[in-house]
Amino acid sequence: TETIVETAFGSDYAGMEIHAAAEKWSSDYVKEYRETNLEFAKEFESGEPSGGVFNWENQLNGYFSGRHEDIVSYTVYNYIYSGGAHGTTTEVAVNMNRNTGKLVNEADFFIPGYREALSGILSSHLRDALPDQESYDALFVKDIEPNGNFKLSEEGITYIYGQYEIGPYYLGIIKVTIPWDELGDLVREHI
């Protein structure tokens, strides 16, 4: 749970029990909101034009998102709006060996020298991950690379690309799934 706490709430909450971290994170967020908006509230009450945004939102959800053999994936979803044109959404996956509790990253999961082959497979599935050709044409890059943010399922491995990472904001989070049978010998045995 230590890794989940740090992924969900940040390094300031590392080492805390999950419920205590959630409570502190929530209270810290309210404190930040009050401190940030106090001056704007005073301006508003006095009738002066205020540049402040009083409508803040922060949604944080975590869930088990899949598994493959002994590896389980836990995903943390976060939407934040604290003013501006739009909010920001992030989705980060953490993979763990359920028998040992050890974190499993790309280098653990794939054989040495995997990046080039995996990049080609990811790129070949990118168009299928988008709703239409217009969305595909809007991407910043079409030859994508593994970014370390992946989750496992019965269907395959899914890479998660954040807003602005490979495409414009309006495309949102882009998820590219590769079926297990296409990964061939790239995956290590007995992780």
Language model: regions and residue ranges:
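Compositionally biased intrinsically disordered regions enriched in Thr/Gly
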Residues: 1-191
